[in-house]
């Protein structure tokens, strides 16, 4: 990936954005999926990329030069809707991460599951929301910013209270309100 000169559209698959803060234990900032542009913010503010990208599954990407994207989005007013869609998607990820970061420690894991469900969940016929197999427990731990002990304690609580379960390597969320939100196309609380 040439982050200095290109922007990438995720056609399929999942990619983790890991904050490049110089520490060895950098955490997942967001998980991007189909329809998301990687490295897009660098086009807007001409800044350096602050993320490392890690594929979580097999992925297909389209590569666009920054110069072509800038020309395409700025020269034609009819592309304003396209720009809006890209920015809405990007800011939804930022908004969800801020909600999770500002929530009390006891709610961080539940918020993590809700965020991932709103971004990537698949509705099941039984009224549950299924996270893609590519989003593993270790990814949820990294995204939540919880210590391992707090994470696994909270994970056990969510399991024993039947809010989540794991079947066939996929996390399943039992939350009718969340299911209804996704069904109605809502992307935030």
Residue ranges and their predicted role:
Residues 1-12:
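Regulatory nucleotide-sensing modules
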Residues 1-3, 21, 32-36:
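Conserved short histidine dyad/triad with adjacent acidic residue
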Residues 13-15, 35:
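Short, small-hydrophobic-rich alpha-helical interface motif
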Residues 14, 58-60, 170:
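Structural motif
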Residues 16-27:
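A short beta-strand-loop-beta hairpin characteristic of the jelly-roll/cupin
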Residues 29-95:
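Cyclic-nucleotide recognition modules
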Residues 81-145:
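Polybasic "coupling" helices that flank or enter modular domains
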Residues 118-189:
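Phosphate-/nucleic-acid-contacting segments
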């Amino acid at each position: 990936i040439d982050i200095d000169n290109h922007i990438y559209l995720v056609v399929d698959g999942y990619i983790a954005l890991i904050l490049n803060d110089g520490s060895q234990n950098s955490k997942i900032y967001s998980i991007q999926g189909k329809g998301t542009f990687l490295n897009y913010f660098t086009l807007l503010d001409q800044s350096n990329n602050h993320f490392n990208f890690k594929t979580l599954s097999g992925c297909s990407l389209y590569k666009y030069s920054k110069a072509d994207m800038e020309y395409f989005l700025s020269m034609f007013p009819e592309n304003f809707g396209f720009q809006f869609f890209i920015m809405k998607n990007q800011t939804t990820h930022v908004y969800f991460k801020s909600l999770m970061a500002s929530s009390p420690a006891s709610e961080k894991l539940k918020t993590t599951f809700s965020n991932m469900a709103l971004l990537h969940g698949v509705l099941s016929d039984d009224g549950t929301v299924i996270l893609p197999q590519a989003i593993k427990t270790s990814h949820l731990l990294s995204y939540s910013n919880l210590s391992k002990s707090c994470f696994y304690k909270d994970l056990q609580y969510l399991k024993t209270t039947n809010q989540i379960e794991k079947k066939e390597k996929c996390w399943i969320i039992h939350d009718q309100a969340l299911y209804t939100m996704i069904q109605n196309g809502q992307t935030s609380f």
